[in-house]
Swiss-Prot record:
It holds the Pfam family YpsA. It comes from Streptococcus mutans serotype c (strain ATCC 700610 / UA159). HAMAP family: UPF0398. NCBIfam families: PRK13660.1 (NF010181). Belongs to the UPF0398 family. It comes from the Bacteria. This is UPF0398 protein SMU_470.
């Protein structure tokens, strides 16, 4: 069994505020290409953290690929109340995460920032590799998780970068 942690930028970090934004189409094309590659390499579990943006788009791609490929999807939320204050539209997205094959929360409620480090460590300890939409030139809080990933021995990290997306746009033209 091979598990891959899937995470990346949130939609607002990319300046994407509408579900019809054309940038999402490009991002999903990259995700589909990479997911097919991972599946052909033997990945059988995709693990999500339940975040909007890249993770949600990746979840949508994974759900569309489930008819062609044998895979399982998991969501491990940091807290049981994750997303409880999201808008109605985003609640629908949260519901999709809650419909994956395996759903758990690491903590009941937020108590202190140390929980995030423990949560991230748990995810890394229970996955074999990561797929991350992250670019070192556009730092966000993802940098902490990325640093943990790259510091872990024998933990391959596949990065999707803005340069990769530019290549896909070039292929469109």
């Amino acid at each position: 069994m091979t598990t891959i942690l899937v995470t990346g930028y949130k939609n607002f970090e990319l300046g994407i505020f509408q579900d019809k934004d054309p940038k999402i189409t490009i991002i999903k094309k990259a995700i589909k290409r990479d997911f097919i590659h991972f599946l052909e390499e033997g990945v059988d579990w995709f693990v999500f953290m339940g975040n909007l943006g890249f993770e949600y788009w990746a979840l949508e791609v994974a759900l569309s690929l489930q008819t062609e490929y044998d895979m399982q999807l998991a969501t491990i939320f940091p807290f049981e109340n994750h997303g409880e204050h999201w808008s109605e539209a985003n609640q629908e997205k949260l519901f999709k995460f809650k419909q994956t094959d395996f759903v758990k929360s690491s903590y009941k409620r937020y108590q202190n920032s140390y929980q995030f480090k423990k949560y991230n460590q748990f995810l890394l300890d229970n996955t074999d590799r990561a797929y991350l939409f992250y670019d070192k030139d556009k730092e966000t809080n993802l940098k902490y998780l990325y640093q943990m990933m790259t510091a872990k021995d024998n933990y391959p990290v596949s990065l999707l970068t803005f340069e990769d997306l530019d290549d896909i746009v070039q292929d469109f033209d």
